[in-house]
Amino acid sequence: MDLDLTGRIVVVTGASRGIGLAVTRAFVAEGARVVAGARSTTPELAALADGGSVIVVEVDLSTHDGPGALVAAAGPRVDVLVNNVGSAHPRPDGFLEITDEMWRATLELDLMASVRAVRAVVPIMRAYGGGAIVNIGSVNARLPDPLVLDYSAAKAAAGSMAKSLSKELGPHGIRVNSVDPGPVATDLWLGKGGVADVVGGAHGASPEDVAAGAAASMVTGRFTRPEEVADVVLVLASTRFGNVTGSNVVIDGGLITTL
C-alpha cells in the first residue's frame, strides 16, 4: 500500500535512538524528508543524514525555545509532527523522594516539549490546509505505576491534550492521534541506567530477570520492537487514513487486559 508520504516534510522529536530513530528511518523509507531533533547526534542518525533525506537539528527539547527552534528549522512547511521525545526515570524510593526539580524535569520533557512543538507547528499546518500530529505516549497513561509516578502523570496529561487538540484542530484539517506503547526494546528499558537496570538494582535482581518478568506480563511474551511502533506512526501520519483523528493506538503485546 502506498501511504502517500513521498515528499512529505516530517518533524520528529527525540530522533537519535530508540523509537524516534525507528520512526525517522521509516519515514525516509517511505520517501519523506525528515527534520530530526535530538540533544546530540548518534552515528545511526548521522548515517541517515548522509543519505540526504534527513536534517539533524541538535537541540534541547526540554527548554522553552527548543521545540520551536526545531520546527522553524523545517522551513515554511511541515506536513507531519511526531512528538516522541521523552524519558522515564524509575523512582524506587517512592513518591516522597520525588523532588520538585524531578517533577519539573519530567514535565518539561514528557509534556511541555510536545505542548511547545504543537504550538509552533499549528500555524504552519493551518496555513497549508492541514497536517498530522502523532504523539508517542505510554501505556502508563492508563496504567499509572508508582515506580514511574511522575512519568505516568505526564503521559496521561499528554494523552488528554492530544484528544482535546483533535477536536479543536480537526476543522482546520489537522489530525491528532496518539500511540501508547508498552515496554519497547530500547535503551529506555534495557540499556544501562534503564528501567530494568534501576529496578533490578533496587530489588536485588538482575536486569535480565526484570526484563523477562516484564515480557511475561504480555500475552505475546515479548517486548515491542521500535519498528513496530514506527509502522503505526506511518499509518496515522498518512492521508490514506484521513478520517482517523482523536484516536489512541495501544501497542503493548496485550499488557492492558481491560476494555
Predicted segments, located by residue:
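Active-site helix of classical SDR
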Residues: V118, A154, A162
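Short, small/polar-rich loop/turn modules that mediate ligand/substrate recognition or access, typified
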Residues: G170, R175, V244-G246
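Conserved glycine-rich cofactor-binding loop
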Residues: I9, S16-R17
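Short C-terminal tail/terminal secondary-structure segment
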Residues: P92, L143, R222, V233-L234, ...
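Alpha-helical segment proximal to the catalytic Tyr-Lys
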Residues: P123, K167-E168, G242
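Residue(s) in the substrate-gating loop at a strand-loop-helix junction
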Residues: S138
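Substrate-binding pocket helix/loop in short-chain dehydrogenase/reductase
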Residues: R91-F95, T99-L107, I133, V199, ...
